[in-house]
């Protein structure tokens, strides 16, 4: 309710701005979740949807390439926020944590075995991830967020140098990863490609296998992992 009331207060002061904010709020939740889409959620911080860090930031990126990667994102699928947490976290209460998929998030075959194999990433390949450099998951540059099966909290900013916790890298020495399709999870369809490394990303940087890229080094359409991702000027 506090989240909704904040929008209404701003509307009295900034009518033009609030139209955009109200549209943003409306589009966050399925219509059936109204009039109180945040029911059952403990408010903690107005940076986050319903005030809960697990539900991710209220404002999503507007700048290429992140706006394209999130263009098809429906944060909660057909669920209301409390239903989403009830399904995907250990508890709706703030102390609940997300439940992650088995088998490192790889899709499973008909015998419930993960579909993956080893692959060598070539020098020059560009990769990205939403998450800290202590993690071991990477994706082809520009993969849509819905294909990654990540929770909304992976979009939270912890370091101002990396808004939305987004990091881009280039392979500088060949290395081997586990490669395979991503299982559906967190109300997302998944089925993108993930690379699981055998040491964390920070270790790969320190050992010279990866280097961090600046924005100017990944701003061309041709660099992206799929042919349907528009470039920054489209």
Swiss-Prot record:
One cellular component term from this protein's GO annotations in UniProt: extracellular region
Lineage, broadest ranks: Eukaryota, Fungi, Dikarya, Ascomycota, Pezizomycotina
Major localization class: secreted
Region listing for Thump, in residue ranges: 21-117
Effect caused by changing residue 194 to A/K: Abolishes the NADase activity
Signals that turn on the gene: Expression is up-regulated during conidiation of A.fumigatus strains displaying high adherence to pulmonary epithelial cells.
Disruption phenotype annotation: Impairs NADase cleavage in conidia.
Protein family per UniProt: Belongs to the fungal surface NADase family.
Post-translational modification: N-glycosylated.
Organism of this sequence: Aspergillus fumigatus (strain ATCC MYA-4609 / CBS 101355 / FGSC A1100 / Af293)
Glycosylation sites: 45, 95, 118
Regulation: The catalytic activity is positively regulated by calcium via its binding to the calcium-binding site.
Protein name, as recorded: Conidial surface nicotinamide adenine dinucleotide glycohydrolase nadA
Ligand binding (NAD(+)): 130, 136, 148
